[in-house]
Amino acid sequence: MATPDGEQVWAQLQPQDRAWLNDLSRRAGPDTELALVGGAVRDALLGQTPLDLDIVVAGQDGQGVEALALASGLPFVFHPAFENATLTLPDGRGADLVRARREHYPQPGRNPEPLPGTLHDDLRRRDFGLNALALRLREDGAPELLDVVGGLRDLERRELRPLHDRSLHEDASRLVRAARLAARLELHPAPELLAQVPDALALADDTPRLWAELKLLLAEPRPGQAARVLDGWGAGTLLPGLPLLEALDVQQNAGTPVQPGTYAAAVLSAAPDAAALAERMALGERPAALLARALSDSYFAPGTPELQLRGLLRPESYLPLTGREVVALGVAPGPAVGRALAHLAGLRQSGAVRSADEERTALRAYLGANPKAT
């Protein structure tokens, strides 16, 4: 492909984003270097419209970053630990102002210690080459595309390449992030990435961010596809329930929406210790509650998450008779309906009925033995 330039990236941004980035550049001053970095540049080069914007601020300390956020006129929250600021754009999206830094990992899996750095330092600390591209913003003149680590070559090859041989050792969550990107953008792993997978797996328990990344994986457009990528890389043990996740993907592909919570419940159904996994991934209580309802004999309407899961976990299950149906079969409206449904529920729980037809037969026998129910 032709070598891309900054104008190509700039053109992919939304007009309102170009406007406020221009305004930010004017307010930054001559001693400050600003650059749009990471996923926004990558996605723009892939022909997509970037929505998540990260801007590196070089030449300023934390006070300078906070002052620039204030000068933007947008609501913001300042994060002192990394001297970053999160702006709230008019449409509700967030945009991060990130002080240029280097990073030191005192211990694998733990948060890195930030150190002052240049724009080039900031790009070299990133996870993969195609995420280390930058668009240098200028108050006057065309934006400049920067590639200091060979990210353009990786993007052309659609290859995920870690930037050094201890990348996944320092932060094993990069393994899951790579799988998410590979599934979403149809990327493949560089040999250097696959070589580091065993190291990442060995450090998974010591890397809280890895479990947070797995939760984010369940919110991907096709979580089953991302889980299949992990499995293909030899990391399938991180996320149980692959066949269920892929089956839910099939439902999505057929036009039936599937919520992240349904995927999470499917994972818990296959976990040796569901409670421990839910806590580690910070899933909250809802997926476990959804799973319990799906495994119950309660009635749920077609298309509900409970029924989506039940069809996978209990393929022999069926839709029990409803109150309207038992009335149509001869039960008198009123309290008799509840008693008839309770009788059928007891038969289901005992295994005495295993289909809607068997419920109808059992209901007729019930009515014969209880004529007052008619």
Swiss-Prot record:
Family, as annotated: Belongs to the tRNA nucleotidyltransferase/poly(A) polymerase family.
UniProt entry keywords in alphabetical sequence: Magnesium, Metal-binding, Nucleotide-binding, Nucleotidyltransferase, RNA-binding, Transferase, tRNA processing, tRNA-binding
Superkingdom of origin: Bacteria
Example of a GO MF term: tRNA binding
EC numbers on record: 2.7.7.-
Nucleotidyltransferase as UniProt keyword: yes
Membrane-spanning intervals of the chain: none
Catalytic activity: a tRNA precursor + 2 CTP = a tRNA with a 3' CC end + 2 diphosphate
Record flagged with keyword Ribonucleoprotein: no
CDD domains: NT_ClassII-CCAase (cd05398)
Organism of origin: Deinococcus radiodurans (strain ATCC 13939 / DSM 20539 / JCM 16871 / CCUG 27074 / LMG 4051 / NBRC 15346 / NCIMB 9279 / VKM B-1422 / R1)
Described purpose of this protein according to its UniProt entry: tRNA nucleotidyltransferase involved in the synthesis of the tRNA CCA terminus. Adds the two cytidine residues to tRNA.
The protein's name: CC-adding tRNA nucleotidyltransferase
The protein's required cofactors: Mg(2+)
Record: residues binding Mg(2+): D52, D54
A biological process term (GO) from this entry: tRNA processing
Residue positions binding CTP: 39-42, 126-127, 131, 171-180, 209
